[in-house]
């Protein structure tokens, strides 16, 4: 029951933001390609600049499944980092442990990836890490604990069952899926990161 409720909530949020946050939400949006609610089919009036920027920020937050406080901290770090703030922001978010667990194909959704981390199934360089926000460094190995490899969901992942719903493995990850191992070979580049976002709108939202 809880899973069904969560799935419906994600589908509703996906329709509201105009982006599929889970494979189930993608199928739901194919059937109902309009916003939620009784007025979802109606033509909407043009959004204000603030509303456009807010929605883009919410879209980015939802794709990484993070809280507003986490987003704000990441933005402040991105702003202090040399380079374009918007690109820096997404690159920093992509180096979160839960994001890389998802990209590697160990999980089907960002929520599942976070659960794997929180429940201590994931190691970084041989050390258990239970913080989804952990920043993985270049060259570090993300892998599943040997005692967890026999779990059915992880056996399913190792067999490549999620590849039909996930983007191709990006070039910044070296993945050995059958071994449930993934190495971050270098810092991700914004152009390679499979998230849908006009990051300049996010920058403008926080800079207002």
Swiss-Prot record:
- What would you give as a GO molecular function for this chain, any one? rRNA binding
Covalent S-S links between cysteines: none
Signal peptide coordinates: none
Q: Name one GO biological process term.
A: translation
Keywords, sorted A to Z: Ribonucleoprotein, Ribosomal protein, RNA-binding, rRNA-binding
Q: What SUPFAM superfamilies does the record point to?
A: Alpha-L RNA-binding motif
Mind telling me which InterPro entries this protein's record contains? Answer: Ribosomal_uS4, Ribosomal_uS4_bac-type, Ribosomal_uS4_CS, Ribosomal_uS4_N, S4_RNA-bd, S4_RNA-bd_sf
**Task performed by this protein:** One of the primary rRNA binding proteins, it binds directly to 16S rRNA where it nucleates assembly of the body of the 30S subunit.
User: What family is reported?
Assistant: Belongs to the universal ribosomal protein uS4 family.
Q: Subunit details for this protein?
A: Part of the 30S ribosomal subunit. Contacts protein S5. The interaction surface between S4 and S5 is involved in control of translational fidelity.
- Please state what the protein is called: Small ribosomal subunit protein uS4
User: What is the species listed in this Swiss-Prot or TrEMBL entry?
Assistant: Pseudarthrobacter chlorophenolicus (strain ATCC 700700 / DSM 12829 / CIP 107037 / JCM 12360 / KCTC 9906 / NCIMB 13794 / A6) (Arthrobacter chlorophenolicus)
């Amino acid at each position: 029951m809880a899973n069904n409720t969560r799935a419906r909530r994600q589908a509703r949020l996906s329709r509201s933001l105009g982006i599929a946050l889970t494979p189930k939400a993608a199928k739901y949006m194919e059937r109902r390609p309009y916003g939620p609610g009784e007025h979802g089919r109606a033509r909407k009036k043009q959004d204000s600049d603030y509303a456009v920027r807010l929605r883009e920020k919410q879209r980015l937050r939802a794709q990484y499944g993070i809280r507003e406080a986490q987003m704000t901290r990441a933005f402040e770090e991105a702003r202090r980092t040399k380079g374009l703030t918007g690109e820096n922001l997404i690159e920093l978010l992509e180096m979160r442990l839960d994001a890389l667990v998802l990209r590697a194909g160990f999980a089907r959704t960002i929520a599942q990836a976070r659960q794997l981390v929180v429940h201590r199934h994931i190691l970084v360089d041989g050390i258990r890490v239970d913080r989804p926000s952990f920043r993985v460094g270049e060259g570090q190995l993300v892998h599943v604990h040997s005692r967890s490899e026999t779990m059915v969901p992880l056996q399913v992942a190792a067999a490549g069952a999620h590849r039909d719903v996930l983007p191709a493995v990006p070039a910044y990850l070296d993945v050995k899926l059958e071994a449930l191992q993934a190495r971050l070979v270098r810092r991700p580049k914004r152009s390679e990161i499979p998230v849908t976002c006009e990051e300049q709108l996010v920058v403008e939202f926080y800079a207002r």
